[in-house]
Amino acid sequence: MAAWGKKHAGKDPVRDECEERNRFTETREEDVTDEHGEREPFAETDEHTGANTKKPEDTAEDLTAKRKRMKMDKTCSKTKNKSKHALRKKQLKRQKRDYIHSLKLLNVLEEYITDEQKEEEEEEGEEEELIRIFQEQQKKWQQYRSVRRERLKEMKLLRDQFVKALEDFEDLCDRVFSDEDSELDN
C-alpha cells in the first residue's frame, strides 16, 4: 500500500473491477487493433459479423431487468392512477361540499332578503298607519277648531246680545228711576 503522504500512481485494480462497463461509451479499440496499432482482420472478431454477440447470461439478466422495469412501470402506473382517482374523488367531494355550502348560503341570503322586505313593508305599513292616524288627528283638530270658532262666534253674538240687553235694561232702569224721581220730586 502507498504511504500516507504519497499519491497512488496508476489505476486501482479493485475499483477497475467494480466499475460497470457501459456499452454505449466503450470504444473497444483494443479489441480491434493489435499491440502495434494495426487492425486485425474482421473474421477473427465477432463484433463485425453482424451476429448477436451477447451471452445467454447477459440476455437473461437483461430480460429480468426489463421485467423488473415493466413491473415497476406497472406499479407506478397503478399508483399514479390511484392517486389521480383519489385526487379526482377529493376534488369532487370538495366541489360537492362547496356546492352545498353555496346553496345554504343562497338560502340564508334569500331568507335575509325576504325578512328585510317584510320588515320594510311592515315599516311602510306602520308609517302609513301613523300618517293616517296623524291625518285623522289633524282632521279632528281642525273640526275641533272650527267648532270652537263657531261656538266663539255664537258666544260673541250672545254676549253682544246680552250686553245690548243689559244696556237696554240699564236705559230702561234709568228712565224708570228718572221718571220715579221726577214723580217724587213733583
UniProtKB/Swiss-Prot annotation:
Composition bias (Basic and acidic residues) maps to 10-27, 34-58
Keywords (alphabetical) are: Chromosome, Cytoplasm, Meiosis, Nucleus
Please provide, in alphabetical order, the Gene Ontology terms of the cellular component aspect for this entry: chromosome; cytoplasm; nucleoplasm; nucleus; synaptonemal complex
Give the tissue specificity: Expressed in testis and ovary (at protein level).
InterPro entries found in the cross-reference section: XLR/SYCP3, XLR/SYCP3/FAM9_dom
Region annotation (Disordered) ranges: 1-93
What are the recorded Gene Ontology BP terms?
A: meiotic cell cycle; spermatid development
Q: State the compartments where it is located.
A: Nucleus; Cytoplasm; Chromosome
Composition bias, kind Basic residues: at what positions?
66-93
Q: Name one Pfam family in it.
A: Cor1
- What does the function comment of this entry state? May play a role in meiosis.
Q: Could you say which protein family the record assigns here?
A: Belongs to the XLR/SYCP3 family.
Q: Which PANTHER family match?
A: PROTEIN FAM9B, XLR/SCP3/FAM9
The molecule here is called Protein FAM9B
Q: Which gene encodes it?
A: FAM9B
